[in-house]
Amino acid sequence: SAFVWHKRFLQCLEAQEKPKRWLLKDPGHLEHIPEILKTYPDARFIHIHRDPSETIPSICSLTSTVRSGFSNSSDKSLIGSQTLEFWKNVLNKYSSNRDNIDPSKIIDISYEDLIKNPLGEAKKIYSHFNFDLDIQTENSMVSYLAQSKGDHKRKHIYSPEEFGLSKEIIQNELSF
């Protein structure tokens, strides 16, 4: 399994100083819940729910940018249909495997709530998983948030239509 290698890689990274816990963000892991649970039985999951009509065009834009570095042609409509189909399959697989996660090891939060109140959502996560949130960590979060205020705003422009999609098509295909 790729996650055996993944675990070894993390162990190499922590050889000098082991962190309290790893926090990894990869939506691509959604389709690998059984493998993750086998490799990391104590894993916790934070499922951030975000409007797919915003995320799919963003992923399409990233894919288009990456492909343009390796190809003279970049069919944006093809990128749109492939991206939508890929994430539809990922989310279907995730939905069928989600019940394998102990409810105490997963929390669902809204992206909008996270943007509006990041510290409150972080506290909710810590509380749900019974993690200690000491004053030093909380102060570090407050400091980081003060320094990065506004950084979450979209930095480039893209639309579903640019990739042969529409908000309605995305919503219909990814409604769970």
Q: Where do the language-model regions lie?
A:
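Flexible loop/turn segments at secondary-structure boundaries
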Residues: 29-33, 53-56, 115-118
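Short beta->alpha linker loops
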Residues: 27-28, 50-51, 113, 140
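Conserved phosphate-donor/acceptor-positioning beta-strand/loop module used by diverse small-molecule
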Residues: 25-26, 36-61
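PAPS-dependent sulfotransferases, especially Golgi type II membrane carbohydrate sulfotransferases
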Residues: 1-17, 22, 59-176
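Flexible, glycine/threonine-enriched loop-and-boundary segments that flank and lead into catalytic domains
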Residues: 9, 15-42
